Amino acid sequence: MTEITAEGNASTTTTVIDSKNGSVPKSPGKVLKRTVTEDLVTTFSSPAAWLLVIALIITWSAVAVVMFDLVDYKNFSASSIAKMGSDPLKLVHDAVEETTDWIYGFFSLLSDIISSDGDEEDDEGDEDTAKGEIEEPPLKRKDIHKEKIEKQEKPERKIPTKVVHKEKEKEKEKVKEKEKPEKKATHKEKLEKKEKPETKTVTKEEKKARTKEKIEEKTKKEVKGVKQEKVKQTVAKAKEVQKTPKPKEKESKETAAVSKQEQKDQYAFCRYMIDIFVHGDLKPGQSPAIPPPSPTEQASRPTPALPTPEEKEGEKKKAEKKVTTETKKKAEKEDAKKKSEKETDIDMKKKEPGKSPDTKPGTVKVTTQAATKKDEKKEDSKKAKKPAEEQPKGKKQEKKEKHEEPAKSTKKEHAAPSEKQAKAKIERKEEVSAASTKKAVPAKKEEKTTKTVEQETRKEKPGKISSVLKDKELTKEKEVKVPASLKEKGSETKKDEKTSKPEPQIKKEEKPGKEVKPKPPQPQIKKEEKPEQDIMKPEKTALHGKPEEKVLKQVKAVTTEKHVKPKPAKKAEHQEKEPPSIKTDKPKSTSKGMPEVTESGKKKIEKSEKEIKVPARRESHQLQNVTKAEKPARGSKEGFEDVPASKKAKEEAEEVSSTKKQKSPISFFQCVYLDGYNGYGFQFPVTPAQYPGESSGKPNSPGPKQ
C-alpha cells in the first residue's frame, strides 16, 4: 500500500505544479528513475506476479535436477526407506523441520525484498513531500496576494460607477416605491385568498348537509316507488330467473360502493348516476367488468350510517333495463323466425304450381326440402295410379327381353359390347360417386349465377312452363320410333354444345323429369327408375340433398323459357322425316334398348367431365339422371298405349335381335371415339346414325321387320 501512497503524492505534486502557472526545476535523471521504480512496484505489488515467480523457480529447478543428475535417487530412496523402517517418527520430525526451514527462509526472502522496495519508496516519498512543502507555500501566498488585490480593485471600480450612476439609482428608488404599493396589493389579495378557502370549506359543509337532506327525501320517495317496482320485477323475474342472478350480485356490490361514496363526496350522486348508465346496459349473458375501488377511497370511507335503499333502486333500474333489452331481443328473434317460415311457405307454393324455385342454396334447410318432396310424392301417387298398373307389365317384358338376349346372341361381336357396357356401368358408378364428392368445390361460383337467375325467374310466369311442357309431352307421345327420337336429342345436344350453351339441353330434359313432378307422366319415371336402373338411386339421393341442385334448377328454369319455343318446331320436323312404316314395330325396344343407348350417352358425358371443369360435371350428371329416367318412361308409355297386347309376343323375338344389331355396337363405338369432341369439334351432330360404318346397319335392321 506504500506504493499507492507514493503514487498519490506524486500525482498531487504534479497536479499542483500543472494547476499553477509556475514550473519547478527538476533534473531529467530523476524522472527516469521514478519510471523504472514505478514499473517494478506496479508489477510486484500484485500477488499474482509473485506466484508466477515461484512457479518458474520450481519448474526450472526441477529441470536442472533432471538434466544434470543433481540428486542420487537410489541412495536417497534407500536411505529414506531404511529410516522409515527404523525410526518413522524421527523421519517425520526431520521432514517437518526441513520444510519449515525452507518455508521460513522463503518468507524471509520475500519480506526482505518487499521491505527493501518499501524503504526505497519511502525515501523517495519523503523527498517528494519535503520538496512539496518547500514549493507550495510561495504559490499559496501568491494566490492570496492576487485575490486581495482583485478584491481591492473591485470596490474601487464600484465607487466610480456609483458616482456616475446616481441618477439611475434615483430612478431605481422611484421604481421601488411604485413596487411597494403593488406588493401591498398582492398581500391583500393573498389574505383574501386565505379567507376564501375558509368560506369554501363552509360552503362545502353546507352542500354536504343539503345533499344528505336531498338523498333522504329521495330515499323516502323511492321506498314508495320500490313497492310498485317490486311487483313489476316479480313478473320479469319469473321469465328470466336463469339470466339475471349473476349480474345482480355484482350490481349490489356496485351500489354498496356507490352508497359509501355518497356520504363522503359531494359529487357522489353524479357518480352514482354515471355508474348506472355505464353498468346498467348489461346483456343477460355478459358479466360486467367492475373495477375494484381504489384503496385510498376505502381508507377514507366511513361505515355507512344510512340504510341502502339506493342499492335497491339501482338493482331495480338495471333489472328493468335488462328486461326491456331481453324482450326486444326475443321479439326480434320471433320476427326473424316468422319471416323465415313465411319465406319457406312462399317457396313451397311457388315450387308446387310453377316449379320455378327462387330460394338461394343454403337459406332453406334440408328438412323443408324433405317436406316438399313428401308432398310432391303424395300428389304423384294420387295421379299415377293408372300408369302404375301398367308398369309391372313393362317390368316383366323387360326381364323377358333381358333373358332372351343371351339365349339368341349368335355372334361374338354383339356379346363383347354388352360386356363392355356392364364394365362401363361399374365405371359410371365410381365416377358418379367421385363427382358427387367434388360438387362442394364450385358452390361459390354457382351462387353468383343464382342471384341473376332468380330475378329472371320471378319475372316469368310458371304457367308458361307448364303449358310448354304439356306440348312437349304430347309431341313425345306421338313419336314412336326410337332412333328418330335419339336423333332429335343427339342433334339438340350437339347443337347446344357447339353454340357453347350446354345448359339449355340439360334444362329441356330435366324439366319434365324433376321440376314438373305433379303431372301424370312423371310418377312413371320415378317408379320405373327403381327396377330398371338401380344405379340411379344413390345419385339422386346425393343430388337432392345438396344446394347445388337448386342452383342448376334455377339456371334451368331461365334457360328453358328462352329455348322453349324452337323446341317443338324441331321435333315436328323430325316427325315429318320419320318413315311411317316402322312406327308399330318398335315400341317395345324402348323398354330395353333405350337404357343401353342412354348409357352410352352417359359414358360420353362422364368422359367429357374429365376434360371440362367441375361445374360441367354437375350438369352432365343431371343429364344422366334425366335421360335414364325419361326415355324408359316414354318408351314404356308408348309401348303400352299404342300397341295392342296380341302383337307383343311376336315382336319380342324380332326386337331382341334388331336391338342387338343396332344398339350394342353403337354404345361401344360411342365410348371409344366420342371422347375428343365434347361439343368443341364438328359443326354437325355426331350421333350413332351418322357414322358411315353403322348407317348401313340402321336401314337394314328395320327391313326384315316390315
From Swiss-Prot:
Glycosylation sites: 75, 625
Tissue: Detected in skeletal muscle and in heart (at protein level). Detected in skeletal muscle and in heart.
Composition bias, Basic and acidic residues: 128-254, 309-358, 372-432, 443-518, 525-552, 570-588, 599-621, 628-651
Cellular compartments per GO CC: junctional sarcoplasmic reticulum membrane; plasma membrane
Region described as Disordered: 1-28, 117-265, 281-663, 684-706
Location in or out of the cell: Sarcoplasmic reticulum membrane
Role according to the record: Contributes to the regulation of lumenal Ca2+ release via the sarcoplasmic reticulum calcium release channels RYR1 and RYR2, a key step in triggering skeletal and heart muscle contraction. Required for normal organization of the triad junction, where T-tubules and the sarcoplasmic reticulum terminal cisternae are in close contact. Required for normal skeletal muscle strength. Plays a role in excitation-contraction coupling in the heart and in regulating the rate of heart beats.
Protein name: Triadin
Species of origin: Oryctolagus cuniculus (Rabbit)
